Amino acid sequence: MAFDLPFIWAAIIAFAVLAYVILDGFDLGVGILFPFFKEKHDRDVMMNSVAPVWDGNETWLVLGGGGLMAVFPLAYATVLPALYMPLILMLLGLIFRGVAFEYRWRTKRGEFLWDIAFAGGSMVATFMQGVALGALVQGIPVENRAYAGGWWDWLTPFSVATGVALLVGYALLGATWLVMKTSGALAARARGHALKAGIGTLVAMGVFSLWTPFMEPLYFDRWFGWPTVAFSLLVPLLVLGCFALLVHGLRTEHDSHPFLAALGLFVLGFAGIGISFYPYIVPASLTIWQAAAPEESLAFLLVGALVLVPMILAYTAYAYWVFRGKVDPEEGYH
């Protein structure tokens, strides 16, 4: 029985990217919401809610990026020159966020500066992730197996709008995480922010669902052609279901339901992108088979992935299990 190794690896990398988005998304969302909570005590609790897990969440970014370079080198060599600027700014934002997270607990006199760095780094990293996604969706020109565009091709109204939409989406993840992990006045305020961000996310998903099909003929065929239209019609219905669960959970104070609903919205958005892209890894220039490394390399790397991915899943699940439940405002991890 022959295995379609490029397809298997595309699924692994897609899973790693999705895991990064939904896991690092909520702690970036906490940083995005930082300016809306002025009290030092609230900010301390917010940071303590993500302190045990935030750095482990970025493991999935390393797996996704490293896997892309090793398994789909042609796609990596094509996408990277097209997105140098947003990716570099994203990494700088993540560095600022990480440094601020640690140094904020070590100083009192300059604490407000690290608060600014934490919020600013989270916003820059999120916005640039959205811009990079928008630039990929709108298409990257390829000629002779190399990037054929200009330095600023990534900066368009569509990519900027995608960056803003991701800021709203991560704010939703962060707010629902705070609803689930905190209590009292902080959780009550987080519910208000979650409802606003949820409405914004729903509107953004609707706008991009109407906008994206007209970016490429491939997308239009995927969303409105038969038989894929039968699957694509399910996505907006499920989105509305997740939004209803979000609102119901916020109103009835079932604190885990809003976070699960927010995760569902991101999974459905990711599924929509998958419907639009497949079988392309660089739309509409390179398929996963055209961009893949030799079969021998894919098989060798798959052996390592079959060991590492379950290990990452196991320690991630264990960390979340150990630190489950509400954060005690009087205790912390720093």
Q: How does the language model describe each region?
A:
Residues 260-267:
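Central hydrophobic cores of alpha-helical transmembrane segments
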Residues 9-20, 81-92, 119-124, 153-167, ...:
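Alpha-helical transmembrane segments
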Residues 53-122, 143, 222-230:
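Membrane-interface helix-loop-helix modules in multi-pass inner-membrane proteins
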